[in-house]
Amino acid sequence: MRSFEYARPETEAEALELLAEHGGNTAVLAGGTDLMNLLKRDVVQPARVVDIKNIPSLRGIKLHDNGVLIGANTTLDELNEHALAADYRSLLDVIEGIRSTQITANGTLAGDLCQLPHCWYYRNGHGLLAMQDGESLVATGDNRYHAILGNGGPAKFVSASRFAPPAIAWDAKVRIVTQARSASEGVETIGVKEEWLPLEYFFITPKTNSQGVTVLKPGQLITHLWLPAPKETRSATYEVLQLEGLDQPQVSAAACVGIEGGIVRTAKIVLGHVAPTPWIAHEASRWLVGQKLTADIAETAGQMAVAKATPLSHNDYKVQQAQTAVKRALLKATNQLGEVL
């Protein structure tokens, strides 16, 4: 691990000031469950690490009439133990699938959303795109856990976030803050500029190693996640987990469905760990509307969700896994899963 400056601000404005320095070559420390591993491996080499755990405004869960506001520093254990969490079953499904108590005790929701890929080429110093002499190491190498969708460009890794699929299915938004400078009569004022962005637009597929995996620019910070009020929406996440090895799913699917009179009125299906970004199954989601959700209908939705998959040389098994995950997430959301297992 290389040396770096350490800073612990107490306000958003202080954090943004510290993040903007060193040309933006800084890193945010919240739970630290992923960052510390990256630092030890020299995968990231920030000049300064900014610890945001001491900023009071970034912690806690607040109920509003039209939704729930979750602070970036809220741990997974705190979310799991909150009375409101039961209304967002798909998020709790993810927490229940995490084997490491260290991750649930220290890891944060915002930290998960900002995770960098677990691709072994990237984690061993080959860059996000894992290119060597103009050729993809992934395409010709061990690609068992890589993308089966959205992999037509140079990016073959899969999005590492476990909470993005269910949060996107809920139409979540994130609050992003940036340092704002203005001058009046020769006096400079430094403030905080905020933006609310639908989470589905937060993730990007990079075309170069320098682009990153989210829209966050150097000096920007996620402060909160917003989830709309659940109303009559039912949700679930189904993860295909490994018995051993990484505490990461091979594939996941999250579903939010609104049912009235036994008929699906709204639906959104999001796949995880199958593409460089969380993958919204638009066609399958639209097709579900107007259907009575049965095991056969759920299976067809799963088939539609992966119809355009382009597996690599060693990961075609993930197509069937993703199809099954969609089916089971839908049935789990409507309390039918036990009938088909």
Where are these regions (language model features)?
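C-terminal structural segment of proteins
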Residues: 1-341
